[in-house]
Amino acid sequence: MTFLEELKARGLVHQCSNLEELSKKLNEKSITLYCGFDPTSDSLHVGNLIPMVSLLRFKKAGHNPIALIGGATGLIGDPSGKNQEREMLLEDLVLTNSKGIGQQLEQITQSKIVNNITWTKEMSVIDFMR
């Protein structure tokens, strides 16, 4: 069974543009992938379990997973598929939450941990749009 077949058998593949091409890439060489984590709380929760286990599976299969903390996107807020926008969090709270989640992710995922606030905080709107 290939790595992708294992993921599919476990119900971890919902949609893919080209399963054949993805399978080929996964079997040919190591890939780098990321999974995002929202800093809406100071701790991970049960909803983060499957993404974290998936990162571990990719690591075990020889790939390079990255856990991405959404420090910048957490400051913006989003509708989260709801009828109303998520409550805007203060910058200090997002920073605290990001640190807490980052420490937990380091212990659990064996992945590189990055925070998108690192490369977006000083970026101008023009630079972002370009």
Which residue stretches match the model-derived regions?
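NTP-dependent nucleotidyl-transfer catalytic core
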Residues: 1-130
